[in-house]
């Protein structure tokens, strides 16, 4: 009897049923939204580790092939005048494999693009300025690093300051927030690179003071240019690249256009400097034969492009700082492969290299844990907001 008693404090069966029907779409939408978010997060993590794999693979292969190139051309000898030459060729090769990325971009768009992208004239102007800026920076740090690693015995230590510049630039340009895990990651990955220096084939012998000073300044400005390029990339993804563009397409588009501009600049430098004349001599005198000379240059260019694609992908997915941390964490891995492949000066895998590898792994893991905590925090916030609604 009380079941049918009208009271403001009670809800009738009919009203309760109506409320249940009204809440069904909301519950269904919530479940679908949760599943979609879980899928997006899982795909994001997969992309993070794939891009990190690109960076490590590209770093290892490029280091091995660059050592191989220096040995086979005789540039590893201290008394060889060619030791300080070929910097424009190196910077050219570092960017020249962009057609391979352009092909992948066209293939991706033909398979997965559902509609054509339209851009306003103002958007086109911003994109043009972005790609020009990145292309100039790409060519600058490619050439400066090529000079630095062949002229300065302290190259690796100066190279380590790249993390400091990236941290400063990303805090100013990208408003990046730091926490203890990110700071720990920066320290560990910096240590990993700082103590892993070895006698590579392109490692300079003791030379005149002016050459050492010249190489040191080139290394320094190269770190500034590289750090700035990463932060400008992140700004481009945040402010310039259209939101309708897929992440994969945006990454390949940025890498292709910036590398194309850098290649043109380095090609001009190659001819203006006269270094193009040395290519024929290297081709004729390559110790393992002409075919392997061509294959080594192609492989070196592709390896650099794979690493660059991974770096740009990490900037898009996470941040410029994380991209740099992964690059530094990969250095000990590349160094160990160099020791295994060439055994320079009876070098072996000792405590320093083992410690550097461990520091690199822990530095990478520390930043990944920071990303994991940030994602969990976002999920909790979104769930709380959904409950309020």
From Swiss-Prot:
Pfam (any one): PUNUT
Annotated transmembrane regions: 46-66, 88-108, 127-147, 153-173, 181-201, 217-237, 251-271, 297-317, 322-342, 349-369
Keywords, alphabetical: Membrane, Transmembrane, Transmembrane helix, Transport
Subcellular localization(s) per the UniProt record: Membrane
Highest taxon in the source lineage: Eukaryota
A Gene Ontology cellular-component term: membrane
Chief subcellular location: membrane
Protein name: Putative purine permease 20
């Amino acid at each position: 009897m009380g079941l049918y008693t009208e009271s403001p404090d009670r809800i009738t069966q009919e009203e309760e049923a109506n409320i249940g029907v009204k809440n069904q779409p909301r519950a269904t939408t919530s479940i679908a939204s949760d599943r979609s978010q879980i899928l997006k997060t899982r795909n994001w993590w997969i992309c993070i580790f794939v891009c990190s794999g690109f960076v490590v693979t590209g770093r290892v292969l490029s280091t091995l092939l660059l050592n191989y190139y220096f040995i086979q051309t005789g540039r590893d000898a201290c008394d060889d005048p060619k030791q300080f030459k070929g910097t424009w060729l190196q910077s050219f090769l570092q960017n020249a494999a962009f057609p391979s990325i352009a092909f992948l971009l066209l293939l991706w768009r033909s398979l997965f693009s559902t509609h054509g992208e339209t851009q306003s004239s103002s958007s086109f102007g911003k994109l043009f300025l972005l790609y020009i800026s990145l292309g100039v920076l790409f060519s600058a740090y490619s050439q400066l690093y090529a000079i630095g690693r062949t002229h300065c015995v302290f190259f690796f230590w100066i190279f380590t300051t790249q993390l400091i510049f990236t941290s400063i630039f990303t805090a100013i340009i990208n408003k990046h927030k730091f926490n203890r895990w990110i700071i720990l990651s920066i320290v560990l990955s910096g240590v990993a690179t700082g103590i892993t220096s070895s006698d590579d084939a392109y490692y300079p012998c003791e030379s005149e003071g002016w050459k050492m000073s010249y190489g040191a300044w080139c290394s320094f400005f190269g770190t500034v240019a590289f750090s700035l390029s990463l932060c400008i990339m992140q700004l481009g993804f945040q402010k310039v690249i259209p939101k309708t563009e897929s992440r994969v397409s945006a990454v390949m588009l940025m890498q292709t256009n910036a590398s194309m501009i850098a290649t043109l600049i380095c090609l001009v430098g190659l001819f203006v400097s006269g270094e193009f004349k040395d290519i024929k001599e290297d081709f004729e005198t390559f110790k393992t034969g002409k075919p392997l000379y061509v294959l080594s240059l192609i492989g070196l260019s592709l390896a650099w492009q794979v690493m660059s694609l991974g770096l740009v992908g990490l900037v898009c997915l996470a941040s410029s700082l994380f991209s740099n941390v992964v690059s530094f964490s990969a250095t000990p891995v590349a160094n160990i492969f160099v020791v295994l492949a060439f055994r320079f000066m009876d070098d072996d895998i000792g405590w320093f290299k083992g410690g550097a590898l461990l520091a690199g792994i822990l530095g990478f893991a520390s930043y990944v844990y920071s990303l994991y905590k940030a994602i969990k925090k976002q999920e909790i916030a979104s769930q709380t907001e959904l409950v309020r609604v």
